[in-house]
Amino acid sequence: MSSPGNVRQKHGRDNDEHEGDSDDLNLQKSLPSSSQQKTPTKPVFGNKVNSESVKTSHHMSFSNKYDLVFPEPVESDNDETLWDVRDLSHRNRWSSVDPESAGPSKTVSTVLSESSTDTAVSERELTQLAQIRPLIFNSSSRAALRDCLKALQKKEELDIIREFLELEEMIPPDDFKSGYELQNRDKNRYRDILPYDSTRVPLGKNKDYINASYIRIVNHEEEYFYIATQGPLPDTIEDFWQMVLENNCNVIAMITREIEGGVIKCCSYWPVSLKEPLEFKHFHVLLENFQITQYFVIRIFQIVKKSTGKSHSVKHLQFIKWPDHGTPASADFFIKYVRYVRKSHITGPLLVHCSAGVGRTGVFICVDVVFCTIEKNYSFNIMNIVTQMRKQRFGMIQTKEQYQFCYEIVLEVLQNLLALN
């Protein structure tokens, strides 16, 4: 099977280094590539290791004012634009600076209603969630974890890059015909990130198209079920919420800001006012509650079917500490975020998206599976998990930095676990 990149090469295109080399998937309108210079991503191979020598060695052996709410990351305990939740144990409500509206241009949330079962999350709770404990934590399981930690610590950077190179050589197992159909081309954020036909998420009785993929990861007979999707476009917002409703998803993990480095990564697809729902043909979406922590935003939505009045609750969790380039400097915030998302998950596949729905989304899914595996005293293999992802959505985990970050996160979790008494 051909990847979107291979299709470009067949038509005489190069590797999307410049916007002028874009393929015209939309005939009169070109889509960007997920790897263009204007999109803030690092090149696959950085400066630490010479990529050509690694490759040789491998083959010898392989539109909103968002900055008003979330300015460039500043590590300050006195930043009044973010509600610091560390003292939340002394509060019994969410912030209520202005109960009229809450959205990307406001640092606002609302008092919890008496009937609400949602409670504000404290930093203490997040710290406890990050302390992953196996079901059985005795001398035998400790020894197994120590062996696992030692094996991971022995892996050098070169070994991890070789693994990533091997993943890059995978042949796509399926076609992308639906994504290339004329009526669907405007529904893709990037021309080189399309879902496989066999794993794409169908919409409605007609199985309409959305750029989203079912991801099922199997480890020791346990299955972990996700939807990996791109950040919604203005014209696909209704499709996105329809997908959430039809798949009974109760959690959305969003791992991007709407704008990063001056580039639009995802549109604001949620209602920003507590009084004005987002109206669609068959349903509307209401914002109920809102909380801003130091590193992610919690929004509680209700999707209400107009025909029946039946309501479906969704918790929207937006991670805001991923830098414009590369990966987070510290794994701590992301570990807490992933654990809170997992704790919040109840029904349907866990829906995850970034901008393209492959890079940060892949990192999230990989480490979430590893965390669940550790809890159940099972062994795990990061490369195997990523291989399974890539068989179901093209290009999951885009860069070697993201792949290395998976290892760094798991190492930190294991070290913290073994340090416990």
Swiss-Prot record:
Sites where the protein binds substrate: D324, C354, S355, A356, G357, V358, G359, R360, Q398
Chief place where the protein resides: nucleus
Top-rank taxon, per record: Eukaryota
Keyword Phosphoprotein tagged: yes
Record Pfam families: Y_phosphatase
Family: Belongs to the protein-tyrosine phosphatase family. Non-receptor class subfamily.
Function: Tyrosine-protein phosphatase targeted to sites of actin polymerization in response of varied extracellular stimuli. Has tyrosine phosphatase activity towards various tyrosyl phosphorylated substrates.
Name of this chain's protein: Tyrosine-protein phosphatase non-receptor type 20
Gene: Ptpn20
